[in-house]
Amino acid sequence: MVKVMIKRHIKDGKAKDVFALLKEQRVKAMNQRGHLNGETLMSYQNPHCLLVISSWQSMENWLYWKESEERRANEARVEQFLESPAEYDEYIFGTYPLYN
């Protein structure tokens, strides 16, 4: 299983736009092979900071969706409302030790 964490810093006054686009993107992700679930969290200390967490059956499933034209197009729409590029962290379960 894979957990993907995407951190975004939203420009002032653009939260409504970003939430609408992220909802649209989540609906599309739900129809992708290997997508398990997703959630969006807002920082308590900084409401302009969002963290999207999604779970996937495999890294291959996630990377296929991440690199798809459909997702790239929607992500480009989201980026216009961000202070900086989204930050991605990808984690895999049950692989210790990963390196020797």
Task: State where each predicted segment sits.
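Residue-level signal for secondary-structure boundary sites
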Residues: 14-16, 60-62, 98
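Generic alpha-helical hydrophobic packing signal
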Residues: 3-5, 18, 51, 77, ...
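Short, surface-exposed ligand-recognition loops at beta-strand->loop->(often short) alpha-helix junctions
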Residues: 9-19
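Short, low-order "capping/linker" segments at domain edges
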Residues: 91-100
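Short alpha-helix boundary/capping motifs
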Residues: 19-20, 68
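An amphipathic, aromatic/His-enriched active-site/gating alpha helix that lines ligand/cofactor pockets
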Residues: 27-37, 55-89
